């Protein structure tokens, strides 16, 4: 480009512009030479070398001299003068346009969007395009801070009048706010800097390119700021560092950069939480906001930059709302540093957040609300959630000249080899993967030390569960999605439905951010080295103790274990398998061998064997002793016919299936006294031998008052055994003592007729209460009130009424025990660190460390066991409303259910209470376990519209569990405790519910219950009663038995011994337990009188009826084809008459046939013989149909049961019609016998029989024809048709 002369001859006041690195004059288009030094203006930087304005300009260029020639540092807008003039002018007005463009840009000393609008560049055919390739023709290249007439490193858009193939940006789009920057190169980055009029500078960086070598080198005084900029902010974001509070070290700071998890921004959870997008749901309920937050976190949409714009748009649509643009809206949309930023922020503050720019305001409206406002689109490439709330004041910038070096982050080492580990396919493969990672980091063995634990399909570990656990354990592992994080040493992959893990053997581990763990990090992410103490202590043991929980609870169990680990002095099974020790390898190998062999040969489950080993290693002080104990387990011989699990273990350690210990001797006595603290003299009642050898415990007992439910929790010594012990309750206000024997707590064992026990109780009545003894252990006595369905009651039923009145102080409880020491290992509760009632109870898994093993979900660490308080109205087989039955030592909860509207006994129990007791509770007081708010059991306890639904589900769980127990063991305490713990395991699946409607959906099918029962078998499993006669015969026999047995008459009073009816498919003899102690007192006729004449008469009547019914059924099935279905449609007496009539008419017909066939003569016409033979044929045909049906039902008992039953009913109905018609013929013949001869009598009977037989023959043919057709069909057709029917 050159004008008339080779060099410009114009005045120095003529404006200049840059083009292709050369300075030209706007008047003559000739190259401008350097001005003389006296004319140069140092305030204008590079422009002042070629241009001397007539008037002083109000803007300055901060970059001084010297600098590289032909680079308009700080004045990049000079390169935009020529392309703007050329693209917006013609051939004849180009010079005038060039002067006009120069005048506009020189006025402000920069290029801004307002200048483009003033020059009407868009109206003259120019558009902004994103740069996707080479740009032909004239164009103006730009990014957020810089413009140039030539492509440059970091350019993102181009302004041109050429019709490029890509989609043009929407107007009014402009990639920059002000373009007047300087460009430098530093390492592998290109840095842009500028200064505004107020002296505050902005900086931006972009990756380098091939043209970066021609740029100036970054000045040394800016290197520190550039390090902070690149580490803390993403590319193409012009940032003023004075708006941000910075830290010296980047390890603990925050970073917006996609390649760095940490930066120099001060980490503030209230500012950088990435959750500001939740402000769009402020109009919704708290449950909705919590659900949206959990959903974004669970599915990986939540990142440190927020959530994707399209995701937020979709969630608003799902909730029936949308965002509209409203200048007065409460929600303000901001962008990080520039409007083109992909990092957005939603705020409710009116002031602009420092470091952000305000874009617009919006409000949330329902989708159905008509509005004239423009709908706000959140954008497909925008992320909302940059900050949590606005900073109140602008943060002071740190010193820019601080020369403290930034710690360098090492790049990942290239991998040398990859090793893959595939864990066992037991449903817990995800947790085996994490265990293998930690086992390799600790012990160098890339295998899982965890034992196999079969999980149902709906409880497999998801990627969200694994991510949560990885973060809790701080593992250098990532979940591989589309790509693997380059900094992760361990890669967890999903192979179909199986989790596997790969290790990069030649790579050093690194600390990964959440984005890297989830697997959504960027290509060039950088992670700091993994610290030496990165893996928490006992991390592997924490996983081993929690991996048997439901998968969504494992991470919480790990966190609770690490927060409050149990004592480490004992070597448990998990510690032996996970902790480093000389015996670990041998113990693990021997244990896996025994686990594979012993349960199989003993016919036991693996869960039972694991639980037995855990019991054997309980309180083991050293690893050597644990190894020695494990070596004592005997492998049963293959020649032995049957070996129990107990025989394989040492004699001093039995493989007891019951979680509660049975070895401790029973307590010989106990006494409970409730009294007031202001009483001068405490009353006490206890057996004398208790005072001699027992230990004492004194605690406070509180009464939580309510309209229908008052609970008294008495914290006492060891487990309370009521059988054979004395229990007394005293009232200090009235000075009266009521013996619990008057209430018959143990079904007759402690009755008023026992004078010795009453004397023992009354003998200690006047002694004071000793408050000096400590409380070594505890049990819980729960007193509750319950209103029966029927207010009437038998005279023998013993009701209990508890009267209420408000006392003046708290109530003290004195409990005494004897027989064992306080340090017994079977003590149910350790209250050495108990909490007061006015403080929140610590319900973490560390304070209540339940470990859901395969055989015992309630087994705990540290010799502590949880108290499972069974809710009301949920009783198992043998339970009663008045649970005063004898309890074994396995019970840690004693329930007294009080009955309303019942007659008061002679000495009612008065329990005093006070609200003031809550503030002065004894520190040893024990509080009942609190379940999550929306768990199934909590919903049952809280009541409400869904309580009945969950109660029915609980009853179904109890019924299915009872079916797996031996009938005679269903009322034992061990079975009841197993039922409660099974329900607790089922209830655990609803602990993560966030709504009251989720628990019912999770537990509706109960598909997981059979596998759970198989993993955790009952104490006495149900035996296999299958025999050779199994099949349809057994099914039909059960059905006939249920139809034939008359239901017992309903009693007048309430039935107390059977709250939940037994399942309908259980045989009658299985309903009543045949062994074991009764769980509750039965009716007076069974308990008190026993052999009275009423009971004998009732049992005799039932026995006679059963014998007669079975006899008549057998006779009828042998000699008459009348359907048993009639027994269910007619009364028993009517069905009996029909059977007798059928037998009689068959006998008469056989008699007539014998007379005709044996005494044949000419007196009998041939047509009579023919009719008789036809009748015989009809009977034979129907009998053959019956036999075919019988044999087919035996050959195919399971394929077409419904089809066989339908045809059977039809054939039986045909026989019934034939029998009825023949009986009518017989009656008519007998009625006409005096007037007719012997021959005519037989002939008339035969004729009638043939007529009725032909009718039944046609009916039977129509019914048997489908049966004969299906007899010759293939099995598949029979099965499909049977299922369709």
Curated annotation (Swiss-Prot):
Name listed for the protein in its UniProt record: Replicase polyprotein 1TF
Domain Peptidase C31: 69-180
Keyword match Nuclease: no
Zn finger limits (C4-type): 8-28
Active-site annotation: 76 (for nsp1-alpha papain-like cysteine proteinase activity), 146 (for nsp1-alpha papain-like cysteine proteinase activity), 276 (for nsp1-beta papain-like cysteine proteinase activity), 345 (for nsp1-beta papain-like cysteine proteinase activity)
PROSITE patterns named among the record's database cross-references: AV_CP, AV_PCP_ALPHA, AV_PCP_BETA
Region annotation (PCP1-alpha) ranges: 69-182
Cross-referenced InterPro entries: Arterivirus_Nsp2_C33 (IPR008743), AV_PCPalpha (IPR008741), AV_PCPalpha_sf (IPR038155), AV_PCPbeta (IPR025773), AV_PCPbeta_sf (IPR038154), Nsp1alpha_Znf (IPR054104), NSP2-B_epitope (IPR032855), NSP2_assoc (IPR032841)
Region entry Disordered, spans: 752-797, 1050-1088
GO molecular function: cysteine-type endopeptidase activity; zinc ion binding
Keyword Cell wall biogenesis/degradation: no
EC number(s) reported in the record: 3.4.22.-
Biased composition (Polar residues): 775-790
Site (Cleavage): 180-181, 385-386
GO cellular component: host cell cytoplasm; host cell membrane; host cell nucleus; membrane
GO biological process per UniProt: proteolysis; viral protein processing; viral translational frameshifting
């Amino acid at each position: 480009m050159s004008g008339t002369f080779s060099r410009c001859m114009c005045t120095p006041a003529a404006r200049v512009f840059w083009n292709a690195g050369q300075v030209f004059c706007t008047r003559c288009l000739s190259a401008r030479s350097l001005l003389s030094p006296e004319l140069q203006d140092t305030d204008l930087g590079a422009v002042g070398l070629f241009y001397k304005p007539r008037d002083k300009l109000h803007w300055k260029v901060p970059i001084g001299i010297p600098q590289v020639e032909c680079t308009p540092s700080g004045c990049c807008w000079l390169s935009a003068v020529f392309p703007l003039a050329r693209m917006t002018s013609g051939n004849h007005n180009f010079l005038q346009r060039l002067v006009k463009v120069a005048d506009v840009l020189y006025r402000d000393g920069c290029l801004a969007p307002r200048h483009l609008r003033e020059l009407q560049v868009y109206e003259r055919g120019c558009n902004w395009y994103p740069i996707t390739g080479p740009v032909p023709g004239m164009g103006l290249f730009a990014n957020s801070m810089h413009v140039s007439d030539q492509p440059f490193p970091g350019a993102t858009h181009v302004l041109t009048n050429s019709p490029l193939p890509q989609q043009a940006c929407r107007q009014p789009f402009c990639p920059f706010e002000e373009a007047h920057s300087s460009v430098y190169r530093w390492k592998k980055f290109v840095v842009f800097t500028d200064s505004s009029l107020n002296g505050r500078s902005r900086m931006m960086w972009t990756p380098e390119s091939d043209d970066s070598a021609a740029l100036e080198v970054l000045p040394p005084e800016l290197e520190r700021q550039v390090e902070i900029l690149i580490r803390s902010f993403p590319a193409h974001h012009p940032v003023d560092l004075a708006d941000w509070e910075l830290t010296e070290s980047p390890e603990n700071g925050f970073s917006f950069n996609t390649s760095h998890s940490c930066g120099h921004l001060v980490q503030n959870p209230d500012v950088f939480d990435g959750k500001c997008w939740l402000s769009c749901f402020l109009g919704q309920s708290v449950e909705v906001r919590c659900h949206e937050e959990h959903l974004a976190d669970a599915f990986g949409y939540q990142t440190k930059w927020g959530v994707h714009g399209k995701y937020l748009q979709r969630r608003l649509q799902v909730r029936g709302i949308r965002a509209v643009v409203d200048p007065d809206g409460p929600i303000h949309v901001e962008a990080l540093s520039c409007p083109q930023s992909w990092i957005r922020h939603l705020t409710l503050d009116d002031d602009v957040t420092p470091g952000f720019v305000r874009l617009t305001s919006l409000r949330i409206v329902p989708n159905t609300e008509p509005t004239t406002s423009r709908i706000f689109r959140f954008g497909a490439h925008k992320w909302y959630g940059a900050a949590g709330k606005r900073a109140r004041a602008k943060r002071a910038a740190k010193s820019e000249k601080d020369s403290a070096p930034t710690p360098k982050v090492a790049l990942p080492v290239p991998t040398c080899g990859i090793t893959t580990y595939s864990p066992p396919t037991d449903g817990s493969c995800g947790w085996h993967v994490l265990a293998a990672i930690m086992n390799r980091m600790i012990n160098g063995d890339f295998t899982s030390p965890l034992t196999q634990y079969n999980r149902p399909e709906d409880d497999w570990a998801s990627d969200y569960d694994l991510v949560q656990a990885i973060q809790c354990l701080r593992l250098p592992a990532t979940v591989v999605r589309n790509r693997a994080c380059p900094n992760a040493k361990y890669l967890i992959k999903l192979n179909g439905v199986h989790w596997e893990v790969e290790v990069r053997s030649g790579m050093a581990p690194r600390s990964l951010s959440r984005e890297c763990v989830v697997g959504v990090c960027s290509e060039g992410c950088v992670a700091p080295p993994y610290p030496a103490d990165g893996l928490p202590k006992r991390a592997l043991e924490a996983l081993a103790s929690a991996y048997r929980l439901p998968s969504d609870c494992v991470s919480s169990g790990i966190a609770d274990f690490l927060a409050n680990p149990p004592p480490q002095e004992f070597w448990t099974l998990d510690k032996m398998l996970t902790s480093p020790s000389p015996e670990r390898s041998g113990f693990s190998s021997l244990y896996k061998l025994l686990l594979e062999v012993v349960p199989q040969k003993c016919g036991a489950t693996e869960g039972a064997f694991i639980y037995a080993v855990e019991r054997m290693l309980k309180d083991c002080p050293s690893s050597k002793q644990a190894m020695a104990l494990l070596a004592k387990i005997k492998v049963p011989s293959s020649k032995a016919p049957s070996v129990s699990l107990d025989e394989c273990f040492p004699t001093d350690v039995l493989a007891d299936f019951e979680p509660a210990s049975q070895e401790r001797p029973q307590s010989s006595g106990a006494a409970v006294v409730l009294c007031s603290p202001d009483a001068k003299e405490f009353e006490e009642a206890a057996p004398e031998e208790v005072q001699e050898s027992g230990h004492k415990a004194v605690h406070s007992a509180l009464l939580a008052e309510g309209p229908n439910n008052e609970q008294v929790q008495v914290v006492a010594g060891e487990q309370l055994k009521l059988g054979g012990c004395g229990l007394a309750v005293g009232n200090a206000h009235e000075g009266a003592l009521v013996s619990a024997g008057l209430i018959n707590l143990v079904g007759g064992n402690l009755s008023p007729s026992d004078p010795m026990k009453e004397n023992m109780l009354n003998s200690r009545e006047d002694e004071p209460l000793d408050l000096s003894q400590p409380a070594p252990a505890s049990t819980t006595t729960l007193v509750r009130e319950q209103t029966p369905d029927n207010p009437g009651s038998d005279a023998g039923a013993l009701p209990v009424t508890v009267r209420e009145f408000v006392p003046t102080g708290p109530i003290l409880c004195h409990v005494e025990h004897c027989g064992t020491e306080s340090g017994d290992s079977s003590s149910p509760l350790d209250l050495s660190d108990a909490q007061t009632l006015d403080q929140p109870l610590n319900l973490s898994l560390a304070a209540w460390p339940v470990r859901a093993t395969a055989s015992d979900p309630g087994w705990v660490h540290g010799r502590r066991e949880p108290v499972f308080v069974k809710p009301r109205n949920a009783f198992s087989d043998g339970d009663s409303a008045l649970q005063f039955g004898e309890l074994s030592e396995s019970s840690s909860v004693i329930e007294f259910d009080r009955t309303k509207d019942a007659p008061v006994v002679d000495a009612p129990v008065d329990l005093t209470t006070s609200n003031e007791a809550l503030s002065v509770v004894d520190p040893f007081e024990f509080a009942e376990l609190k379940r999550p708010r929306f768990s199934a059991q909590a919903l049952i306890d809280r009541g409400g519209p869904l309580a009945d639904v969950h109660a029915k589900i609980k009853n179904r769980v109890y019924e299915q569990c009872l079916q797996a127990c031996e009938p005679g063991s269903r009322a034992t305490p061990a079975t009841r405790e197993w039922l409660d713990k099974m329900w607790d395991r089922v209830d655990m699946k609803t602990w993560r519910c966030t709504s009251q409607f989720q628990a019912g959906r999770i537990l509706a099918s109960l598909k997981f219950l059979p596998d759970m029962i198989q993993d955790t078998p009952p104490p006495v499993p149900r035996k296999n009663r299958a025999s050779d006669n199994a099949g349809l015969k057994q099914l039909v026999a059960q059905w006939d038995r249920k139809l034939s047995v008359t239901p017992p008459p309903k009693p007048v009073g309430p039935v107390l011994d059977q709250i939940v009816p037994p399942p309908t498919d259980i045989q009658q003899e299985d309903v009543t337990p045949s062994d074991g102690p009764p769980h509750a007192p039965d009716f007076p006729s069974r308990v008190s009188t026993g052999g009275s004449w009423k009971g004998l008469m009732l049992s005799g009547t039932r026995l006679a009826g059963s014998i007669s019914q079975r006899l008549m059924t057998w006779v009828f099935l042998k000699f008459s084809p009348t359907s048993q279905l009639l027994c269910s449609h007619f009364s028993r007496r009517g069905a009996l008459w029909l059977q007798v009539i059928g037998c009689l008419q068959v006998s008469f017909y056989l008699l007539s046939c014998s007379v005709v066939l044996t005494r044949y003569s000419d007196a009998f016409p041939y047509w009579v013989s023919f009719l008789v033979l036809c009748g015989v044929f009809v009977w034979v045909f129907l009998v053959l149909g019956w036999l075919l049906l019988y044999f087919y039902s035996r050959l195919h008992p399971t394929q077409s049961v419904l089809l066989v039953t339908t045809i059977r009913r039809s054939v039986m109905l045909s026989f019934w019609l034939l029998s009825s018609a023949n009986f009518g013929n017989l009656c008519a013949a007998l009625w006409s016998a005096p007037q007719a001869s012997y021959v005519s009598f037989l002939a008339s009977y035969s004729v009638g029989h043939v007529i009725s037989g032909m009718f039944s023959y046609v009916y039977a043919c129509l019914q048997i024809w489908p049966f004969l057709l299906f007899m010759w069909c293939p099995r598949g057709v029979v099965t499909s048709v049977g299922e369709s029917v």
